[in-house]
Each structure stands twice: as C-alpha cells, then as structure tokens.
Amino acid sequence: LMMPAIWILAISSALMYVSRYAVNSWGVFYLETQKGYSTLDASFIISIGSVCGIIGTMFSGVISDKFFSGRRNAPALIFGLMNVMALCLFLLVPGVHFWVDALSMVLFGTAIGVLLCFLSGLMAVDIAPRNASGAALGIVGIASYIGAGIQDIMSGILIGGHKSIVDGKEIYDFSYINIFWIGAALLSVFFALLVWNVKSKD
C-alpha cells in the first residue's frame, strides 16, 4: 500500500468515475436541455451506453489477453482515449443528431466497461504485491466512488451556477461542464500512463 503506483491508479480510476457518473446522472438532462431531445429519446440514447458497458466488461479480459499478451496498459490507453472521444462527440456536437449521439454512447459505454475492469480492477491486482492485492482493490474502489460523489456535487454547482432566465425560459451554459467532464477523462488517461511500466514487487 506504500506503492505510489496504487494511489496514482486510484486517482486515474476516480477521474474515470467522474465521466462515468456524469453521463449516467446528468446525461438525460443534458440531452433534453442542451440538445432539445424528448425525455424518451434522451433516456433511450443514454441506455445505449449502459448496454455497451456490459459488452465492454464482458470482453475486456479477452481483449487484453488475446490482442495484447495480457498487458493492460495499452488497452487502457486506447479505451481511455475512446472515452475522451465519446464525450467530445456527446458534448461538442450541437443539436439533435440521433445517430451521432447514439454512436457516442456506444463508444462511451464500451470504453467505460473496459476501463472499469482495467483501472478499477485488473491493473491494481497486477501492480500490487500478492499479499496486498485485496487492499489495493479497496483503495482504488474507495477513490473511485469518492470521484463519483465529487462529480455529482461539482456538476450540480456548475450547472446550477450558470443558469439564466431569458424570456421566462431557463437557459444553461454547459461550457464549464464540457471542460469538467472531458478534462476528467483526459486526466484519467494521463494518470494511467504514469503507471505504464510499473510491475508488482513480488
């Protein structure tokens, strides 16, 4: 537990949880408010991410074992960047473009599903000594949910704090949310890169 790599990985996972729960908690609201979707359509689009997350989780081990000889760092980088790209599609393409937003959720869900296994699980086990693997998983797990909690608070502040009333309608400025969510995903990739060559001391 004194290994800095475990704590760095915990930060990376926490930042990934920021983007995960940002979309899960606020995605429907964002699509309705910023892009003009109906509640039904917005909910359907976000649900695509959940389904693809299951697929990403199911195949994460196969991806690393079959295509990367059991290494987790390269696929963590690839799917971390996929998460960033998905958020950019979701947040930065204005208006109602159903297939673009659906594609963003396919990419997002798949990426998050894989990253959940790698950042929040397998990489911690690979790095930690055998007699401390459970504790390492606990640290990463706690940090991840702290990240999720901070996300809800910060997103609420950023959304509520940049609301204005124009002609009797509530108008939201999501530019700060874009920076927060995409920035968290980018920083998650950065911190994951810092443990690229770290190996267990066993």
Which functions belong to the PLM regions below?
Residues F90-P94, F174, I179-D202:
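Multi-pass alpha-helical transporter architecture, strongest
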Residues L31-E32, I63-F68, M154-S164:
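Interfacial helix-cap and linker-helix signal at transmembrane-aqueous boundaries
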Residues R130-S164:
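A late C-terminal transmembrane helix in Major Facilitator Superfamily
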Residues D65-G80:
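Cytoplasmic membrane-interface "Motif A"-like loop-to-helix N-cap segments
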Residues L81-G95:
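C-terminal ends and interior cores of transmembrane alpha-helices
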Residues M2-S60, L116, S120-G121, A148-S155:
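Extracytoplasmic gate region of multi-pass secondary transporters
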Residues S69, M123-S133:
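Paired intracellular helix-loop junctions of major facilitator superfamily
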Residues R71-A74, I157-A185:
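A membrane-interface helix-boundary motif in multi-pass transporters
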